């Protein structure tokens, strides 16, 4: 995969397909290639750009030691767009990627053609209470003690909430030991800190791009009403609830998810 020097880091990315640009942003810890169920479909219709965000698991983007924010990662994305000569693009963000996508649409409205926000929130206060500790937050959403956070246990809880039982067993049995050996869990402090600082609620009304907010009815990692709030505050937003889908709708309900996204991007 090629790399681009953007915003002070070397960012690993991939481009497939032809057509209007579509940039996919993965959730906390996930690398760009985790979009495989979407890329193989979307590349038939769009120029699909995926990338490894800072501190992504199994990624090859630089992992800076200094703290950063969602706005920082939105700036990374703009830098990649500039590197690729992309003036405007459709933006699809899943989970943490949706938080980055909101920052991008708020701060760079002229660069966003259409926006898709999947399984995401606009504030750390909308994260499921069971997962607050993973992001170093106390129950009142104030910053807790980073040193006391058992990241492996926290991601185990998140995975159990996000995936059906079969996928959960696969992830815990196969991927978690690899992540442990590579020191990935301990490297996630940067992304977790960015999630803890997420707060775009009061700026959602400034988003100009036509927006699809899509969430599963069995969502447990983030509070379901977060999507309803986003859809109500973003002008020209459409809310879709995928019946039976969990936080991991892009994997478990991939056919329905892909169809909803393509229908939205092609509409109007």
Which role does the model predict for each range below?
Residues 9-62:
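Conserved HGGG/HGGXW glycine-rich cap/lid loop of the alpha/beta-hydrolase fold
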Residues 50, 54-92, 259:
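Active-site loop/oxyanion-hole signature of alpha/beta-hydrolase fold enzymes
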Residues 106, 113-143:
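Flexible "cap/lid" loop of the alpha/beta hydrolase fold
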Residues 126, 147-196, 201-203:
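Conserved alpha/beta-hydrolase catalytic His-Asp/Glu region
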Residues 207, 213-215:
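Short beta-strand/loop motif that positions the catalytic acidic residue
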Residues 242-258:
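Catalytic histidine-centered segment of alpha/beta-hydrolase-like enzymes
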């Amino acid at each position: 995969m090629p790399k681009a020097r953007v915003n002070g880091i070397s960012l690993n990315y991939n481009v497939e397909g032809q057509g209007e640009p579509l940039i996919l942003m993965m959730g906390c810890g996930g690398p760009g290639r985790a979009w495989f169920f979407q890329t193989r479909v979307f590349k038939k219709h769009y120029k699909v750009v995926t990338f490894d965000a800072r501190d992504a698991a199994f990624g090859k983007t630089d992992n800076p030691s200094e703290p950063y924010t969602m706005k920082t990662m939105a700036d990374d994305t703009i830098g990649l767009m500039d590197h690729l000569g992309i003036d405007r693009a459709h933006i699809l963000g899943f989970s943490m990627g949706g938080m980055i996508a909101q920052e991008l649409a708020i701060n760079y409205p002229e660069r966003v053609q259409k926006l898709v926000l999947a399984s995401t929130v606009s504030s750390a206060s909308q994260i499921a209470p069971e997962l607050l500790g993973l992001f170093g937050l106390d129950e009142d959403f104030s910053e807790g003690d980073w040193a006391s956070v058992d990241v492996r246990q926290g991601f185990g809880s998140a995975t159990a909430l996000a995936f059906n039982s079969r996928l959960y067993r696969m992830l815990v049995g196969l991927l978690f030991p690899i992540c442990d050996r590579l020191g990935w869990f301990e490297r996630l402090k940067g992304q977790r800190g960015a999630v803890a600082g997420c707060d775009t609620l009061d700026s959602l009304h400034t988003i100009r791009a036509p927006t699809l907010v899509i969430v599963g009815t069995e969502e447990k990692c983030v509070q379901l009403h977060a999507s309803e709030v986003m859809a109500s505050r973003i002008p020209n937003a459409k809310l879709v609830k995928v019946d039976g889908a969990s936080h991991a709708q892009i994997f478990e309900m991939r056919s329905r998810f892909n169809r909803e996204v393509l229908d939205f991007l092609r509409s109007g």
